[in-house]
């Protein structure tokens, strides 16, 4: 479910050494399954352990996960990285905003999962996003751009060289193309 690197495990052991006996760490997702999902790690004293928590055992400590966060922390990883700028704990949870879908799920659900877990996080760096409007009977994914992508001068390149290529590679034989139906209105919101 959650992988924790050796360096992160050592970091947690060091932090927990200064806490009361029996304190664990808690890994959680606030607003799981939504675009506002936020992941975090905190101390979990013994009296904060719930009966339905999932307990994960690591070397020198245990990690507690509340029942509603479990599915959204599938394939999550925690690392502790040190570089010239200092040290940083990173938590990556690709399924926090949307549950991972099975390979035999309907095409619309699988496309939506890729959009939410892979494409929109990339577009977010420019303040943008896309939404799947529909998949036509002839296999065209109809998309609508929002945020900084609406009116962006590079939207055609993003669509054809990025999004379409990625989706066609992932859904070969099921998807035949993508089409943008956004009424692009360049403005202060547009990424330039």
UniProtKB/Swiss-Prot annotation:
GO terms for biological process: iron-sulfur cluster assembly; protein maturation. Keywords: 4Fe-4S, Iron, Iron-sulfur, Metal-binding. One of its GO terms (molecular function) is 4 iron, 4 sulfur cluster binding. The keyword 4Fe-4S applies. Binds 1 [4Fe-4S] cluster per subunit. The cluster is presumably bound at the interface of two monomers. Its cofactor is [4Fe-4S] cluster. It comes from the Bacteria. [4Fe-4S] cluster binds at residues 149, 152. InterPro entries: Fe/S_biogenesis_protein_NfuA, FeS_biogenesis, FSCA_dom_sf, HesB-like_dom_sf, NIF_FeS_clus_asmbl_NifU_C. Belongs to the NfuA family. Homodimer. Involved in iron-sulfur cluster biogenesis. Binds a 4Fe-4S cluster, can transfer this cluster to apoproteins, and thereby intervenes in the maturation of Fe/S proteins. Could also act as a scaffold/chaperone for damaged Fe/S proteins. NCBIfam families: PRK11190.1, YhgI_GntY. HAMAP family: Fe_S_biogen_NfuA (MF_01637). This is Fe/S biogenesis protein NfuA. It comes from Shewanella denitrificans (strain OS217 / ATCC BAA-1090 / DSM 15013).
């Amino acid at each position: 479910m959650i992988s924790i690197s050796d360096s992160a495990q050592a970091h947690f052991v060091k932090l927990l050494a200064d806490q009361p006996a029996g304190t664990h760490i808690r890994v959680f997702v606030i607003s799981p399954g939504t675009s506002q999902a936020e992941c975090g790690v905190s101390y979990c004293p013994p009296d904060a352990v719930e009966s339905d928590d999932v307990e994960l055992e690591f070397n020198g400590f245990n990690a507690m996960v509340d029942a509603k966060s479990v599915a959204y922390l599938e394939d999550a990883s925690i690392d502790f990285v040190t570089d010239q700028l200092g040290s940083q704990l990173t938590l990556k949870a690709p399924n926090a905003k949307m549950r991972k879908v099975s390979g035999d799920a309907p095409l619309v659900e699988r496309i939506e999962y890729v959009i939410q877990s892979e494409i929109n996080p990339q577009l977010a760096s420019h303040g943008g996003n896309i939404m799947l409007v529909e998949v036509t009977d002839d296999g065209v994914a109809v998309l609508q751009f929002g945020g900084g992508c609406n009116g962006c001068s590079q939207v055609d390149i993003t669509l054809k060289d990025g999004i379409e290529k990625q989706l066609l590679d992932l859904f070969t034989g099921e998807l035949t193309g993508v089409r943008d139906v956004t009424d692009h209105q360049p403005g202060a919101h547009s990424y330039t």
